[in-house]
Every structure is written in C-alpha cells, then in structure tokens.
Amino acid sequence: FEDVIDANLTGAFRVAKRATKGLLKLKRGRLIFVGSVVGSVGAAGQVNYAASKSGLVGMARSFARELGSRGITANVVAPGFVETDMTSTLDEKRRAEIAAQVPLGRFCSAEEIADVVTFIASEKAGYITGATIPVDGGLGMGH
C-alpha cells in the first residue's frame, strides 16, 4: 500500500512543491497531475491505486486555492483504459470485456492524453483550475 501511495501521491507532491518555487517567482504556471478514472470509480483489488489517484484530486484542488491568486493553476487529467505495453498483454477476450464497459467502446491512446495535457498547459486553459478532466471514453461519467 505505502509503495503505491509514495510513488503516485507523495512523489507528485514532492515534485509539485519543488516546481512551485520557480512558478511563484514567475507569477504564473501550471501544475498538471495524471490521475485515473479509478480514482473516481474505484476498482476491485486496487484500493492502494484508487486512493493514490483520488488523493491527487484533493491535492490539485488545494493547490488551486492556495496558488490561484499567484497565477498558478492546478488540474488533474484522469485517463481511463489506455493502449500501453501492459494492456497489450491482455488476451482479446479480456480486452473486449474492458472495452465493452467504455461508452466509446475502445481504449484511449497515449496521444489523446497528451493532447489534453498540452491544452491544460497552454494559455488557452488559463481560467481552468481545480478541475479533473476525464480522458476515459465516458467510463467515469457522473463522477
């Protein structure tokens, strides 16, 4: 449990804390955390992972309140099931079962996540803070 919390939550906090020093000097910036749909909907056998990813949401919202007046935004991008080396090892039956849970009926690509992160990092997203942006094909809608 602690290893997952340390990697996903404590690690993110330490990086954000260090980055914030420079952002405060600039009086602008973006903190972008990569969460997961599992942080909103949970997953059997994944209490540690779900806790670590949902913790990012509270952390981003706290940073948003604390740093917003200084021109710094904080948001979470929350992917669903993603085409990765890890998910490619799943057999076709399991992949189909997972995809059937997703309203769009497929896994997300890494590029689709990167596009959202790029937008959140841009000036066009300057008025978005404290948000969790799902990139999950509708899997977590309503959460």
Tell where the protein language model's regions lie, with residue ranges.
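A conserved structural motif in NAD(P)-dependent oxidoreductases
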Residues: 103-113, 124
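Short, small/polar-rich loop/turn modules that mediate ligand/substrate recognition or access, typified
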Residues: 28, 68, 73, 128-130
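Substrate-binding pocket helix/loop in short-chain dehydrogenase/reductase
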Residues: 1-5, 98
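Short C-terminal tail/terminal secondary-structure segment
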Residues: 41, 118, 129-143
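Active-site helix of classical SDR
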Residues: 16, 52, 60
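Alpha-helical segment proximal to the catalytic Tyr-Lys
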Residues: 21, 65-69, 126
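Residue(s) in the substrate-gating loop at a strand-loop-helix junction
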Residues: 36
